[in-house]
Amino acid sequence: MLNLLIKLTLSVAILFYNFSVNAACMKEGDKVVLSGVMKEELFYGPPNWGEERQHDEKLFYWILHLNSPLKCVNDANTERDGWDSNVQLIVSSEDYKTKRNLLNHHITVDGNVMLAVTGYHMTSVLLKDISFKPIE
């Protein structure tokens, strides 16, 4: 009986531990605030996604190089290099025009977490519906 009680107690403890770990993780749709250096970076698109750079479409995206790496994002592709330190920003056409002066500077943005789905998503984690915060 004591053995059964110990096993039950251990099972409950492990279950609560797993819930607490996942509760601390970001998930798609979460509103977050991130800081880092924003850079415009070149990526290659169709038709060969960098295999034949002279023929591939050139894609320029704004990438936030985070001050502190992400710890946990549910369902993110954590096998991709830099998954936890670089976030692609989904920027409005108006912000592309008016916020270029912030490139290569330390910034703070808030927005909603989005996970990479297509070949046009260059980082595992993206940030959409963003707004730029005043630099303090």
Label each PLM-derived region with a short phrase:
Residues 18-20:
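N-terminal signal peptide c-region/cleavage motif recognized by signal peptidases
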Residues 2-11:
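Sec-dependent signal peptide recognition
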Residues 74-98:
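Beta-strand/loop nucleic-acid-binding surfaces
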Residues 29-60, 67, 111:
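Structural detector for short beta-strands of small beta-barrel domains
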Residues 94-109:
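Short nucleic-acid-contacting surface segments enriched for D/E, G, S/T with interspersed K/R
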Residues 66, 117-136:
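OB-fold/S1-family single-stranded nucleic acid-binding modules
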Residues 56-82:
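Mature extracytoplasmic domains of secretory-pathway proteins
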Residues 22-30:
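Cleaved targeting-peptide boundary
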